[in-house]
Structure formats: structure tokens, C-alpha cells
Regions:
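Arg/Lys-rich, alpha-helical DNA-contact motif
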Residues: 2-16, 26, 30, 35-36, ...
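Short coil turns linking two alpha-helices in DNA-binding domains
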Residues: 21-23
């Protein structure tokens, strides 16, 4: 079974996976959208859950034109709808937020 919270990926690898810049990841960290683990030498290590979370945020900001605060809020709303078995609004059914942590 895959441990989604195990820190595995450096900031460079994470940026490459997400097709973004390391500075963008640092900004997301500064805003509290994701908090990577740190090594003994203070290097950032991202988990698979961090990458899933960042990918969901990117889909909402790039694909739907939301700002970062709105993307975070929408993820929380979708998680609440899913947790209570309430159908999602049309157009938001394909966004997977099951393993996202915001």
C-alpha cells in the first residue's frame, strides 16, 4: 500500500512533475497551501499527497481561472459535499479531492 504522506520528492523533482517553477512551489508554501517536510539539512521534501494537492490547485487556477484563496475554498466545499453524499454542481464532478489536504 502506498503511503501518500511519505516525503519523497525534492522541490526540483516536484516542480518538474507539476510543470511549474520552484519559486511557485515556494510561494504555495508561504501561503500555507502545502507544507513540505524538511530534511536534517533543511531541504524540502514533498509527498505524493502534496503533489496531488498541488495538482488540484493548479487545475482550479489554470483550468477554471480561480485565484488561490478561491481554489482552496472550493476544494474544502467539494470535500464537504462528498463527505455528506451531496451531489456536486454540474461541471465540478471531475475534480478529484479525495486525497487532497488543504
Amino acid at each position: 500500500m502506498l503511503n501518500l504522506d511519505k516525503p519523497l520528492y525534492t522541490i526540483g523533482i516536484t516542480a518538474e512533475i507539476l510543470a511549474t517553477h520552484t519559486r511557485t512551489l515556494m510561494m504555495y508554501e508561504h501561503l500555507g497551501l502545502v507544507v513540505p517536510s524538511r530534511t536534517a539539512t533543511n531541504r524540502r521534501l514533498y509527498s505524493q499527497r502534496d503533489i496531488i494537492t498541488l495538482g488540484a490547485i493548479q487545475r482550479l487556477t489554470r483550468g477554471y481561472g480561480l485565484n488561490l484563496v478561491s481554489a482552496r475554498y472550493l476544494i474544502l466545499c467539494l470535500q464537504l459535499l462528498d463527505a455528506h453524499g451531496i451531489p456536486r454542481p454540474a461541471g465540478l464532478t471531475e475534480i478529484d479531492v479525495e486525497h487532497v489536504k488543504v
